[in-house]
Swiss-Prot record:
The lineage of its organism: Eukaryota, Viridiplantae, Streptophyta, Embryophyta, Tracheophyta. There is a cross-link at residues 29-58 (Cyclopeptide (Gly-Asn)). Expressed in flower, stem, shoot and pod but not in root, leaf, seed and nodule (at protein level). Belongs to the cyclotide family. Moebius subfamily. One of its GO terms (biological process) is defense response. This is Cliotide T2. Residues 1-28 form the signal peptide. SUPFAM superfamilies: Cyclotides (SSF57038). Probably participates in a plant defense mechanism. Not active against Gram-negative bacteria E.coli ATCC 700926, K.pneumoniae ATTC 13883 and P.aeruginosa ATCC 39018 at concentration up to 100 uM. Has cytotoxic but no hemolytic activity. Disulfide bonds join 34-48, 38-50, 43-55. The presence of a 'disulfide through disulfide knot' structurally defines this protein as a knottin. This is a cyclic peptide. Residues 59-132 form a propeptide.
Length: 132
């Protein structure tokens, strides 16, 4: 009786291991990793955006896009972000296969970092001269 239980446990373990090893691993992980569907065009998981009807990782949306007009946050230059009104900075992904960047507001994100690190507001200003 114990032999049957042990055998069924071994078979179950083998099936689980084979399924886990067959999952294709990509650089950015699964595109469904956000784990939610779009609610009124919004995704609440950080690093995810709505690609109706599901939320996808931002770099997956940028990889699959053919033009910058396919998503409101895609850009090729800072000017694209200004024109769309979705930010003032176009940041490109470190993966060279992604030809588009992602728009965001550089100053507002800087203030969020300031609050996170509890820095003073003056630390974000660019120095006018270099002091040796």
């Amino acid at each position: 009786m114990a032999y049957v239980r042990l055998t069924s446990l071994a078979v179950l373990f083998f099936l689980a291991a084979s399924v886990m090893l067959n999952v294709k691993k990509t650089e950015g992980g699964e595109f469904l990793k956000c784990g939610e569907s779009c609610v009124q065009g919004e995704c609440y998981t950080p690093g995810c955006s709505c690609d109706w009807p599901i939320c996808k990782k931002n770099h997956i949306i940028a990889t699959n896009a053919k033009t910058v007009n396919q998503h409101r946050l895609l850009c090729e230059s800072h000017e694209d972000c200004f024109k769309k009104g979705t930010g003032n900075y176009c940041a490109f992904f470190p993966d060279s296969d992604v030809h588009f960047g992602w728009c965001f507001y550089a100053e507002s994100d800087g203030y969020l970092l300031k609050d996170f690190f509890k820095m003073s507001k003056d630390n974000l200003k660019m120095p006018m001269t270099i002091i040796n």
